Amino acid sequence: MARITVEDCQERVDNRFLLVQMAIKRVHQYREGYEALVDSRNKEVVTALREIAAGKVLPDEEARYVETEEDFRAE
């Protein structure tokens, strides 16, 4: 089983406070009905970190919400 660490995510997002904010916002999106972008049987927070480490989610310019690959395809 692969372990996810904050260091794995910081390769994509260098600001750890922004990283935490992104993970929280992504968990809120799951609870609103968004689907996970990676296969994971873990808790929501771990799934969010896996998505960030995989580059599947990115912060928007104002960090109000997290953009997913699906958001980019819709544009």
From Swiss-Prot:
<dbReference type="InterPro" id="IPR006110">
    <property type="entry name" value="Pol_omega/Rpo6/RPB6"/>
</dbReference>
<dbReference type="GO" id="GO:0003677">
    <property type="term" value="F:DNA binding"/>
</dbReference>
<keyword id="KW-0808">Transferase</keyword>
<comment type="subunit">
    <text>The RNAP catalytic core consists of 2 alpha, 1 beta, 1 beta' and 1 omega subunit. When a sigma factor is associated with the core the holoenzyme is formed, which can initiate transcription.</text>
</comment>
<dbReference type="Pfam" id="PF01192">
    <property type="entry name" value="RNA_pol_Rpb6"/>
</dbReference>
<keyword id="KW-0240">DNA-directed RNA polymerase</keyword>
<dbReference type="GO" id="GO:0003899">
    <property type="term" value="F:DNA-directed RNA polymerase activity"/>
</dbReference>
<comment type="similarity">
    <text>Belongs to the RNA polymerase subunit omega family.</text>
</comment>
<comment type="function">
    <text>Promotes RNA polymerase assembly. Latches the N- and C-terminal regions of the beta' subunit thereby facilitating its interaction with the beta and alpha subunits.</text>
</comment>
<dbReference type="GO" id="GO:0000428">
    <property type="term" value="C:DNA-directed RNA polymerase complex"/>
</dbReference>
<dbReference type="InterPro" id="IPR036161">
    <property type="entry name" value="RPB6/omega-like_sf"/>
</dbReference>
<keyword id="KW-0804">Transcription</keyword>
<protein>
    <recommendedName>
        <fullName>DNA-directed RNA polymerase subunit omega</fullName>
        <ecNumber>2.7.7.6</ecNumber>
    </recommendedName>
</protein>
<dbReference type="GO" id="GO:0006351">
    <property type="term" value="P:DNA-templated transcription"/>
</dbReference>
<keyword id="KW-0548">Nucleotidyltransferase</keyword>
<dbReference type="InterPro" id="IPR003716">
    <property type="entry name" value="DNA-dir_RNA_pol_omega"/>
</dbReference>
